[in-house]
């Protein structure tokens, strides 16, 4: 409560009898209000409570500072004297107040309580009004601040929503970017891992291939080592073979062979009923093939002993040519007819000429029956020949003889072929002149008397065809040929004669051509051999008549069947009117062949 209001209340509530006692207090406090009159003080306390409060504030402060109850009591006691002093003074505005004014006219002590109550009520009303205004202002300010706060909050919410939306958009963009980047990185990593796996697999395959190739290389090295060892062994064997061939004594071998074949075979006159049937024959064959050219072959066989009791051939005589003689004496010794042992079987078979063999072989051919020369005739077997008897044996012998005679008459003056180690020579005899055709160069014709002498020798030998030899320049070995075309005439038979052997004109110092490891003898040796063979052929021709009357026809028939079988083993292509030589070393790709 304000200080002035309290003073007034105290002043109004104090009875009147106590005014004298308190006058001293008023005097004590008179200095405090000496600057203002009482009316001004009261007026200010009624209409300007703030001023009264400001004025009373120092007093209230001083009272509180003193903290003494005595001073307060003294101050309260001096209040009624002030009120009474105010009542005695004139009004400020001078005049009656119709409305009663703020203060009514001075009243008595009994009515002063009502006035104070009114004053308090008015004071309360003014205070309430001021408080209400203050409160209203405060509420309005609060409301305005709330509105402002609400607007600011709404603005902040809008801003926050926009910011949050932008943040969300940016976060979504960042998430998408991160997802795409991670997917790309995953793809790259997967491709890298896959490439690495493929590379490792390829490396493993390459390692496997390398190991396989390494194994193959090792195997190849081992094979090469084996081949080197094999080559060394073969070279050693070749050296040993060369040493053995170098140690071979050809003259001693020839002497031993001569000693073995010089002794004639012992024949039992009691068991031998017919002379030897094997003779020196020029066997001819003829096979007509439309797609091939005729090839000439010639076989030479010497008398061989026939044992009718055993049904097989005994060792007979064959023309054996010695090997590599260095002088004429050894050649003459080797040129003598030799008796060789024949294989003890029932068949006399021809040896097939091998074109790819380095060592030349003279084919031995047997006689051919009438079925080979007469069209439509079949070769009989052994059982058929045995069943037919001795009558058919005679017809076979006649056909065989007539075939030889016709061949002799047709090819009496045929050309002779001989070969030089350097070139092939073809000698044609015609009208007393000799023409030689070679591979690289030509030779001058021989003298006419040599050709004439050859014809005389052929006539002396009863028109037996000349055996021609064809030499291979590659291996320096001759090949015998056979004149083939036949035209049989029944009832004719002439003795057989051995062929004429020719000497190579290109080798005057060493007139030797190896045949089966042997040599071709000079003229003296040829003459001796021819005389020997002529005697043998005459002996054989005298005994031919015994074939038909022999009681051992079956054995003889089997012998001829053996000859026929041997002849039929190697069929030849022939054409009448042509005489060609077959070179053992001939090849279809060789331009040097005829």
From Swiss-Prot:
A matching Pfam family: IHO1
Region span, Disordered: 434-454
Compositional bias (Basic residues): 444-454
Positions carrying Phosphoserine: 588-589
Gene Ontology CC entries for this record: condensed nuclear chromosome
InterPro entries: IHO1
Location relative to the cell: Chromosome
Domain of life: Eukaryota
GO biological process: DNA recombination; homologous chromosome pairing at meiosis; meiotic DNA double-strand break formation; oogenesis; regulation of homologous chromosome segregation; spermatogenesis
Summary of the function given for this chain in its UniProt record: Required for DNA double-strand breaks (DSBs) formation in unsynapsed regions during meiotic recombination. Probably acts by forming a complex with MEI4 and REC114, which activates DSBs formation in unsynapsed regions, an essential step to ensure completion of synapsis. Not required for HORMAD1 functions in pairing-independent synaptonemal complex formation, ATR recruitment to unsynapsed axes, meiotic silencing of unsynapsed chromatin (MSUC) or meiotic surveillance.
The protein's assembly and partners: Part of the MCD recombinosome complex, at least composed of IHO1, REC114 and MEI4. Interacts with REC114. Interacts with MEI4. Interacts with HORMAD1. Interacts with ANKRD31.
UniProt name for this protein: Interactor of HORMAD1 protein 1
Species this protein is from: Homo sapiens (Human)
